[in-house]
Swiss-Prot record:
UniProt key word Cytoplasm: yes
Protein name: Actin, cytoskeletal 1B
Pfam families: Actin
Sequence positions bearing N-acetylaspartate: D3
Gene: CYIB
Sample GO molecular function, one term: ATP binding
Length: 376
């Protein structure tokens, strides 16, 4: 299929961040926000080389004058032109490779619309002339990265969360559950509850500030009610944060109220089960014989599982739902932010995987629908 000296590319294009690298790497080479920014003001200085759009970190650094848009929402691409810009930026500016020379492994959330992966396939072959490509399910790659073949992965990124039970390397599609509640919803919720405190964040650029507050200061309480009482009676939980203009804001119970929405989606007005219940429901959809192995191998993955305290809280909540004697183990690897990308790197460098690629030739014969036959 392809020579050994040509490394495959692994691109984990998430709703919030793109993680990209080469097969065989133990960490992504490029990590940048999946953002396309367009100027919201008229350019007046000649010779500045102003562009009509900026991608990734450059958009982030000029956010004060740009309108920032994420081309992916809830794991589904909503703007293909912008997505193409992001891929172009990934290949040419971040990884500095010619896409027509390397096979590329892309990732996607389970239970995504079929049209989404077809279009991904089409763009890779027709716009970038990839020699071969493959679309893998994110959670499955996370399990590879944790060195297991059996377990249930709870993967939560910026756009979508899902639980995928995997037994001896087989994903169990009937038991996969998807929850459209993830990092971006938490950021929006934090924006809302900070407004109640008298701090107003409204623009797309200010949302990025709130995301930073969330990532630096939020944590999951082991006992939410008790934590609320502690916060009300003392200022021990308060932390201050300096905004880019030097103004300092104080945040208290918002620190744990924000990620609490993962366990109580009703906070966001969502009528769905929390992440602990979703995990439990997913396990209960599996065969009774394998549940024990799933309970003992619950793997967390993705950026929205990076909150301190989330593993202990998951342990507590799932223990309360599961049968009393069941051994429950939550695995939260420190590199779980990038475990999808790392898993992709492992998968793409396996010798047994080389016959799994969709080649340009197969694509030319069958069209975009080949992706459903070749990729799980």
């Amino acid at each position: 299929m392809c020579d050994d000296d040509v490394a495959a590319l692994v691109i984990d294009n998430g709703s919030g961040m793109v993680k990209a690298g080469f097969a065989g790497d133990d960490a992504p080479r490029a990590v940048f926000p999946s953002i396309v920014g367009r100027p919201r003001h008229q350019g007046v200085m000649v010779g500045m080389g102003q562009k009509d759009s900026y991608v990734g970190d450059e958009a982030q650094s000029k956010r004060g004058i740009l309108t920032l848009k994420y081309p992916m929402e809830h794991g589904i691409v909503t703007n293909w032109d912008d997505m193409e810009k992001i891929w172009h930026h990934t290949f040419y500016n971040e990884l500095r490779v010619a896409p027509e020379e390397h096979p590329v492994l892309l990732t996607e959330a389970p239970l995504n619309p079929k049209a989404n992966r077809e279009k991904m396939t089409q763009i890779m072959f027709e716009t970038f002339n990839s020699p071969a490509m493959y679309v893998a399910i994110q959670a499955v790659l996370s399990l590879y990265a944790s060195g297991r073949t059996t377990g249930i992965v709870f993967d939560s990124g910026d756009g979508v969360s899902h639980t995928v039970p995997i037994y001896e390397g087989y994903a169990l599609p009937h038991a996969i559950l998807r929850l459209d509640l993830a990092g971006r919803d938490l950021t929006d919720y934090l924006m809302k509850i900070l407004t109640e405190r008298g701090y107003s964040f409204t623009t797309t650029a200010e949302r990025e500030i709130v995301r930073d507050i969330k990532e630096k200061l939020c944590y999951v309480a082991l006992d939410f009610e008790q934590e609320m009482q502690t916060a009300a009676s003392s200022s021990s939980l308060e932390k201050s944060y300096e905004l880019p203009d030097g103004q300092v804001i104080t945040i208290g119970n918002e620190r744990f109220r924000c990620p609490e929405a993962l366990f109580q989606p009703a906070f966001l007005g969502m009528e769905s089960a929390g992440i602990h219940e979703t995990c439990y429901n997913s396990i209960m959809k599996c065969d009774v014989d394998i549940r024990k192995d799933l309970y003992a191998n619950t793997v967390l993955s993705g950026g929205s599982t990076m909150f301190p305290g989330i593993a202990d809280r998951m342990q507590k909540e799932i223990t309360a739902l599961a049968p009393p004697t069941m051994k429950i183990k939550i695995i939260a690897p420190p590199e779980r932010k990038y475990s999808v990308c790392i898993g992709g790197s492992i998968l793409a460098s396996l010798s047994t995987f080389q016959q799994m690629w969709i080649s340009k030739q197969e694509y030319d014969e069958s069209g975009p629908s080949i992706v459903h036959r070749k990729c799980f």
